[in-house]
Amino acid sequence: MKLVRTFLAFVVFLGACATLSGVDPEEWEGFQIFTNHHVEINVRFDSAEGRLVLNVFNDDNLTFYQPGESVFWIKDNHLFTLPTPVPDGLSTLGEPGDEIYLLPSSLASGDQERILHGMSGYGLGNNDLVEGTAPMILADVSGPGDVLLWLNSDEVYWDTGRPEGEFGFFENTPGGHHHRTWGFNRRGIHILTLETEGTVKATGQPAVTEATSFLYMIDPRSHEWWQLRHFGFEALKPHAALDHPSPANGLPNLISYAFDLDPHASSLAGMPRPEIRLSDDGKRRLALRHRRPQGDPEKETRSDLIYQLEGSENLHNWTPLEEGDENDYRLISNGEDDDGTPLLLAVLNETIEDSPYRFLRFRIVLNSQ
């Protein structure tokens, strides 16, 4: 019940915005990662070119950022439950009891763990456009789920449940600073493409505009960080899918992800390789040396993968093996690869003479949870 009450409070309450921690975004792989920041999608007018420009403004450090380098990371502390009944205007998000990711329009004093995300018109003057305001038009959305932006259930600005091309708009004001409630009903990578428009007051001509994309990581899984790192804003394209073979080395992206290989490089040097290990007892054991990336504790941990070691006598029939001193094999640390990636050895417990297996391989499984 607590989650439902919190959701309803966010729908109807628009209070003073809490001041957040005043920190810069985290830099990661060429991206600026916004998590618990006070940050807006901003529109400004470039009078020299008669152009309306969309960018990102961070209120915490009063700095503008390019959309192509900005990522909004929405963690699982934004997870809420839809109430019973779901207000009519919000039905696109799901059924009563469904979980959604909710970005609130305001934060309680002292809440520094969630994002405060809005719209602003810094750099847009009262006399720049004939219309005065500049609409933030949601032109397209790529991703696994739906997106809504609303003030209340009777005033929904964006709704991807509407027909394509009619998702809606939010009217941004000159110098404005607006916060509304956002809802995403699926985890994963979402890319929102926005457009704006207006008539230049000084010339009477339409302002030059272009579609601009903004990337949201909604409670992402580890492999989605890998896709972002290697494919950027093309992370949702077919060639970035885990089951897609890399044109550079022919490996499925899932294999490149599992062993932290560059999908754009032709080299296969980082693939697992067999070894004969001479143990402390003087006996030889078959082993498989492989990269086991650790990554950032909150990013590329490979926590969504299962590394299933399998053994075979003839390369035709394969048997799943269990890890453990009393089972089939042990995992032991084997230093680092040339790029610092941790190396592990999967070493059979039985000697070469006693083991029924002459060949080893890993079966990589993406955990569905």
Language-model regions, residue ranges each:
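Short tyrosine-centred short linear motifs in exposed loops/low-complexity segments
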Residues: H178, R186-H190
